[in-house]
């Protein structure tokens, strides 16, 4: 198993195989995955870093990619900025995630410890893209270009969490191998505990189909 926050995901499979002499692969790797933030809001909003610079299209294909984008930002600080129209469209389920609300963008910036003028300029530029239906910075799908213009305005701090990777080296028949490439008799592995090739930006499918095949 790989630790993605579930209390039962403690690496028991990896530890057991290591005790039996398995060759463990990728144990120093980790994935930055976005912590639980409502995607209905984040994809329609604007994301900025600590300098109030927008840093991507807000429409990442997978939370691991979204988390990695946050990890690349200065001090790993990122904010999701949106207005009350976007909040209302997402429903009440979004409200618990909102950390800052203000009647103006400048006041919202102060609450988030951001530069008020810089954030106001960033929002104005983004709203221009929304009006034209063309994102000149990151080519965001026009379907998700929603202007940020109706007060109150809201912000969610975007955070990533670590998901540990690594697993046993196996052969095509799912035998677990030792560091010399020899089969450890009677020991098999499939699924995430044998998923040594999953890393920060490489997503192989976690091997769950192999686990079903072995079963």
Model regions: which residues?
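An anion/pyrophosphate-binding glycine-rich loop and adjacent beta-alpha core
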Residues: 14-16, 20-118
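Glycine-rich, flexible loop/turn motifs
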Residues: 43-44, 51, 77, 134, ...
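Gly/Pro-rich active-site capping loops and adjacent beta-alpha segments
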Residues: 54-78, 178, 183-199, 205
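A glycine-rich dinucleotide-binding beta-alpha-beta segment and adjacent secondary-structure elements
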Residues: 118-197
